[in-house]
Protein backbone atom coordinates (compact mmCIF):
# COMPACT_ATOMS: atom_id res chain seq x y z
CA UNK A 1 0.00 0.00 0.00
CA UNK A 2 1.41 3.35 -0.95
CA UNK A 3 2.21 5.91 1.75
CA UNK A 4 0.13 8.64 0.13
CA UNK A 5 -3.30 8.11 -1.25
CA UNK A 6 -4.77 10.09 -4.03
CA UNK A 7 -7.36 12.74 -3.05
CA UNK A 8 -10.21 13.97 -5.11
CA UNK A 9 -8.79 17.54 -4.92
CA UNK A 10 -5.44 16.42 -6.09
CA UNK A 11 -6.18 17.01 -9.67
CA UNK A 12 -3.27 18.68 -11.28
CA UNK A 13 -5.14 19.46 -14.44
CA UNK A 14 -7.33 22.15 -12.79
CA UNK A 15 -5.60 25.51 -12.69
CA UNK A 16 -7.37 28.27 -10.75
CA UNK A 17 -5.34 30.93 -12.58
CA UNK A 18 -6.37 29.70 -15.91
CA UNK A 19 -8.76 31.49 -18.23
CA UNK A 20 -12.12 32.03 -16.44
CA UNK A 21 -13.98 30.97 -19.47
CA UNK A 22 -12.51 27.55 -19.08
CA UNK A 23 -13.92 27.13 -15.49
CA UNK A 24 -16.63 24.55 -15.36
CA UNK A 25 -20.21 25.77 -15.34
CA UNK A 26 -20.79 24.52 -11.78
CA UNK A 27 -18.33 27.09 -10.36
CA UNK A 28 -19.71 30.11 -12.29
CA UNK A 29 -21.61 32.85 -10.31
CA UNK A 30 -25.06 34.31 -11.00
CA UNK A 31 -25.05 37.72 -12.55
CA UNK A 32 -26.64 40.52 -10.37
CA UNK A 33 -29.89 42.22 -11.31
CA UNK A 34 -29.54 45.39 -13.30
CA UNK A 35 -30.08 48.56 -11.17
CA UNK A 36 -33.41 50.30 -11.38
CA UNK A 37 -33.39 53.63 -13.07
CA UNK A 38 -33.48 56.61 -10.65
CA UNK A 39 -35.36 59.68 -11.60
CA UNK A 40 -34.78 62.58 -9.22
CA UNK A 41 -37.52 64.69 -10.70
CA UNK A 42 -40.30 62.12 -10.28
CA UNK A 43 -43.61 63.43 -8.76
CA UNK A 44 -46.42 61.78 -6.72
CA UNK A 45 -50.02 62.22 -7.66
CA UNK A 46 -51.75 63.66 -4.54
CA UNK A 47 -55.54 63.99 -4.89
CA UNK A 48 -56.38 67.66 -4.54
CA UNK A 49 -60.07 66.94 -3.82
CA UNK A 50 -59.36 65.56 -0.30
CA UNK A 51 -58.90 69.06 1.12
CA UNK A 52 -62.17 70.20 -0.42
CA UNK A 53 -63.97 67.14 1.01
CA UNK A 54 -62.69 67.88 4.51
CA UNK A 55 -63.84 71.48 4.31
CA UNK A 56 -67.24 70.36 3.07
CA UNK A 57 -67.59 67.86 5.94
CA UNK A 58 -66.55 70.47 8.49
CA UNK A 59 -69.11 72.86 7.08
CA UNK A 60 -71.78 70.15 7.23
CA UNK A 61 -70.92 69.35 10.87
CA UNK A 62 -71.10 73.03 11.80
CA UNK A 63 -74.51 73.30 10.17
CA UNK A 64 -75.77 70.23 12.06
CA UNK A 65 -74.43 71.58 15.34
CA UNK A 66 -76.16 74.89 14.76
CA UNK A 67 -79.39 73.06 13.94
CA UNK A 68 -79.19 71.01 17.17
CA UNK A 69 -78.60 74.16 19.22
CA UNK A 70 -81.56 75.82 17.56
CA UNK A 71 -83.79 72.84 18.37
CA UNK A 72 -82.60 72.75 21.99
CA UNK A 73 -83.41 76.44 22.37
CA UNK A 74 -86.83 75.87 20.82
CA UNK A 75 -87.59 72.96 23.17
CA UNK A 76 -86.43 74.98 26.17
CA UNK A 77 -88.61 77.89 25.12
CA UNK A 78 -91.65 75.61 24.86
CA UNK A 79 -90.92 74.02 28.25
CA UNK A 80 -90.63 77.45 29.86
CA UNK A 81 -93.91 78.52 28.28
CA UNK A 82 -95.63 75.35 29.52
CA UNK A 83 -94.22 75.84 33.02
CA UNK A 84 -95.41 79.47 33.11
CA UNK A 85 -98.87 78.36 32.01
CA UNK A 86 -99.03 75.93 34.95
CA UNK A 87 -99.15 72.82 32.78
CA UNK A 88 -97.28 69.83 34.19
CA UNK A 89 -95.96 67.16 31.84
CA UNK A 90 -96.63 63.84 33.56
CA UNK A 91 -94.07 61.27 32.51
CA UNK A 92 -94.76 57.69 33.56
CA UNK A 93 -92.19 56.63 36.12
CA UNK A 94 -93.86 54.17 38.52
CA UNK A 95 -93.42 51.31 39.14
CA UNK A 96 -89.73 51.58 38.16
CA UNK A 97 -89.55 48.17 36.50
CA UNK A 98 -92.67 48.77 34.36
CA UNK A 99 -93.83 52.42 34.45
CA UNK A 100 -97.60 52.79 34.28
CA UNK A 101 -98.34 56.04 36.10
CA UNK A 102 -96.68 59.33 36.96
CA UNK A 103 -95.79 59.47 40.65
CA UNK A 104 -93.24 61.79 42.29
CA UNK A 105 -94.37 62.84 45.75
CA UNK A 106 -90.98 64.05 46.97
CA UNK A 107 -90.57 66.56 44.12
CA UNK A 108 -94.14 67.64 43.32
CA UNK A 109 -96.07 67.61 46.60
CA UNK A 110 -95.41 70.37 49.20
CA UNK A 111 -93.36 69.05 52.07
CA UNK A 112 -96.05 69.69 54.70
CA UNK A 113 -98.48 67.51 52.71
CA UNK A 114 -96.14 64.69 51.77
CA UNK A 115 -96.93 62.60 54.86
CA UNK A 116 -100.66 62.60 54.09
CA UNK A 117 -99.97 61.79 50.45
CA UNK A 118 -97.69 58.90 51.34
CA UNK A 119 -100.32 57.42 53.66
CA UNK A 120 -102.95 57.86 50.95
CA UNK A 121 -100.66 56.03 48.56
CA UNK A 122 -100.31 53.30 51.19
CA UNK A 123 -104.08 52.97 51.29
CA UNK A 124 -104.06 52.66 47.50
CA UNK A 125 -101.52 49.83 47.68
CA UNK A 126 -103.47 48.36 50.59
CA UNK A 127 -106.55 48.08 48.42
CA UNK A 128 -104.47 46.22 45.84
CA UNK A 129 -103.32 43.78 48.54
CA UNK A 130 -106.87 43.32 49.85
CA UNK A 131 -108.36 42.52 46.46
CA UNK A 132 -105.43 40.31 45.49
CA UNK A 133 -105.68 38.30 48.71
CA UNK A 134 -109.43 38.14 48.14
CA UNK A 135 -108.73 36.32 44.87
CA UNK A 136 -106.42 33.87 46.66
CA UNK A 137 -108.95 33.10 49.39
CA UNK A 138 -111.88 32.76 47.00
CA UNK A 139 -109.80 30.51 44.74
CA UNK A 140 -109.15 28.27 47.74
CA UNK A 141 -112.87 28.18 48.48
CA UNK A 142 -113.61 27.33 44.85
CA UNK A 143 -111.15 24.42 44.96
CA UNK A 144 -112.92 23.14 48.08
CA UNK A 145 -116.24 23.10 46.25
CA UNK A 146 -117.82 26.56 46.55
CA UNK A 147 -118.33 26.99 42.79
CA UNK A 148 -116.71 29.19 40.12
CA UNK A 149 -119.14 32.13 40.37
CA UNK A 150 -117.49 33.66 43.42
CA UNK A 151 -114.07 33.35 41.73
CA UNK A 152 -115.21 35.29 38.65
CA UNK A 153 -116.68 37.98 40.90
CA UNK A 154 -113.39 38.25 42.82
CA UNK A 155 -111.54 38.75 39.52
CA UNK A 156 -114.02 41.47 38.53
CA UNK A 157 -113.48 43.25 41.85
CA UNK A 158 -109.74 43.33 41.28
CA UNK A 159 -109.82 44.33 37.60
CA UNK A 160 -112.31 47.15 38.18
CA UNK A 161 -111.33 48.16 41.71
CA UNK A 162 -107.60 48.84 41.33
CA UNK A 163 -107.63 51.12 38.25
CA UNK A 164 -110.95 52.59 39.39
CA UNK A 165 -109.48 53.62 42.74
CA UNK A 166 -106.49 55.25 41.06
CA UNK A 167 -108.58 57.20 38.57
CA UNK A 168 -111.47 58.10 40.85
CA UNK A 169 -109.78 59.20 44.08
CA UNK A 170 -105.99 58.79 44.22
CA UNK A 171 -105.08 60.81 41.14
CA UNK A 172 -107.52 63.62 42.05
CA UNK A 173 -105.98 63.78 45.53
CA UNK A 174 -102.46 63.81 44.06
CA UNK A 175 -103.33 66.68 41.73
CA UNK A 176 -105.21 68.52 44.47
CA UNK A 177 -102.16 68.35 46.71
CA UNK A 178 -99.91 69.48 43.87
CA UNK A 179 -102.02 72.33 42.54
CA UNK A 180 -103.96 73.18 45.72
CA UNK A 181 -107.21 73.04 43.76
CA UNK A 182 -110.38 73.26 45.86
CA UNK A 183 -112.53 71.52 43.25
CA UNK A 184 -110.16 68.57 43.03
CA UNK A 185 -110.31 68.26 46.82
CA UNK A 186 -114.10 68.21 46.61
CA UNK A 187 -114.04 65.45 44.00
CA UNK A 188 -111.65 63.44 46.17
CA UNK A 189 -113.96 63.63 49.20
CA UNK A 190 -116.93 62.52 47.13
CA UNK A 191 -115.23 59.46 45.62
CA UNK A 192 -113.15 58.51 48.67
CA UNK A 193 -116.31 58.11 50.75
CA UNK A 194 -117.39 55.39 48.33
CA UNK A 195 -114.00 53.74 48.76
CA UNK A 196 -114.37 53.71 52.55
CA UNK A 197 -117.93 52.39 52.28
CA UNK A 198 -116.77 49.52 50.06
CA UNK A 199 -113.93 48.58 52.44
CA UNK A 200 -116.28 48.52 55.45
CA UNK A 201 -118.85 46.54 53.48
CA UNK A 202 -116.19 44.05 52.32
CA UNK A 203 -114.98 43.59 55.90
CA UNK A 204 -118.49 42.45 56.84
CA UNK A 205 -119.56 41.01 53.45
CA UNK A 206 -123.28 40.49 54.07
CA UNK A 207 -124.91 38.47 51.28
CA UNK A 208 -127.25 41.26 50.19
CA UNK A 209 -125.59 42.94 47.18
CA UNK A 210 -122.59 40.87 46.21
CA UNK A 211 -122.39 37.11 46.26
CA UNK A 212 -121.64 36.47 49.92
CA UNK A 213 -118.47 34.38 49.68
CA UNK A 214 -116.92 36.42 46.86
CA UNK A 215 -115.58 38.81 49.54
CA UNK A 216 -113.46 37.75 52.49
CA UNK A 217 -115.58 39.39 55.18
CA UNK A 218 -116.30 38.24 58.71
CA UNK A 219 -119.66 36.61 57.86
CA UNK A 220 -118.31 34.40 55.02
CA UNK A 221 -115.26 33.58 57.17
CA UNK A 222 -117.47 32.22 59.95
CA UNK A 223 -119.57 30.35 57.42
CA UNK A 224 -116.70 28.58 55.62
CA UNK A 225 -114.77 27.88 58.83
CA UNK A 226 -117.24 25.19 59.80
CA UNK A 227 -116.75 23.41 56.49
CA UNK A 228 -112.99 23.81 55.96
CA UNK A 229 -110.52 25.24 58.45
CA UNK A 230 -107.93 26.26 55.81
CA UNK A 231 -110.46 28.24 53.78
CA UNK A 232 -111.76 29.82 56.99
CA UNK A 233 -108.24 30.96 57.94
CA UNK A 234 -107.76 32.51 54.49
CA UNK A 235 -111.05 34.38 54.83
CA UNK A 236 -110.18 35.65 58.30
CA UNK A 237 -106.87 37.01 56.96
CA UNK A 238 -108.80 38.82 54.23
CA UNK A 239 -111.17 40.19 56.86
CA UNK A 240 -108.18 41.58 58.76
CA UNK A 241 -106.84 43.22 55.58
CA UNK A 242 -110.15 44.96 54.86
CA UNK A 243 -110.41 46.17 58.47
CA UNK A 244 -106.90 47.63 58.34
CA UNK A 245 -107.63 49.26 54.98
CA UNK A 246 -110.79 50.83 56.39
CA UNK A 247 -108.93 52.30 59.37
CA UNK A 248 -106.13 53.75 57.22
CA UNK A 249 -108.65 55.23 54.78
CA UNK A 250 -110.61 56.89 57.60
CA UNK A 251 -107.38 58.45 58.90
CA UNK A 252 -106.52 59.76 55.43
CA UNK A 253 -109.86 61.45 54.86
CA UNK A 254 -109.72 63.01 58.33
CA UNK A 255 -106.27 64.48 57.71
CA UNK A 256 -107.15 65.76 54.26
CA UNK A 257 -110.34 67.32 55.57
CA UNK A 258 -108.50 69.03 58.43
CA UNK A 259 -106.05 70.55 55.95
CA UNK A 260 -108.89 71.45 53.61
CA UNK A 261 -110.79 73.34 56.30
CA UNK A 262 -107.71 74.89 57.88
CA UNK A 263 -106.40 76.29 54.60
CA UNK A 264 -109.69 77.94 53.68
CA UNK A 265 -110.27 75.69 50.70
CA UNK A 266 -113.86 74.98 51.77
CA UNK A 267 -114.86 78.61 51.33
CA UNK A 268 -112.89 78.80 48.11
CA UNK A 269 -114.67 75.73 46.75
CA UNK A 270 -118.06 77.27 47.57
CA UNK A 271 -117.11 80.48 45.81
CA UNK A 272 -115.82 78.57 42.80
CA UNK A 273 -118.96 76.45 42.63
CA UNK A 274 -121.15 79.56 42.90
CA UNK A 275 -119.18 81.34 40.20
CA UNK A 276 -119.47 78.38 37.83
CA UNK A 277 -123.19 78.06 38.51
CA UNK A 278 -123.69 81.74 37.67
CA UNK A 279 -121.65 81.41 34.49
CA UNK A 280 -123.66 78.36 33.47
CA UNK A 281 -126.92 80.21 34.16
CA UNK A 282 -125.83 83.19 32.10
UniProtKB/Swiss-Prot annotation:
The chain crosses the membrane at residues 118-138, 150-170, 185-205, 233-253. The modification Phosphoserine is found at residue 31. Residues 18-30 have a biased composition (Polar residues). Pfam families: SCAMP (PF04144). GO terms for biological process: protein transport. Keywords: Cell membrane, Coiled coil, Cytoplasmic vesicle, Membrane, Phosphoprotein, Transmembrane, Transmembrane helix, Transport. Residues 1-49 are annotated as: Disordered. InterPro entries: SCAMP (IPR007273). This is Secretory carrier-associated membrane protein 1. It comes from Arabidopsis thaliana (Mouse-ear cress). The gene is SCAMP1.
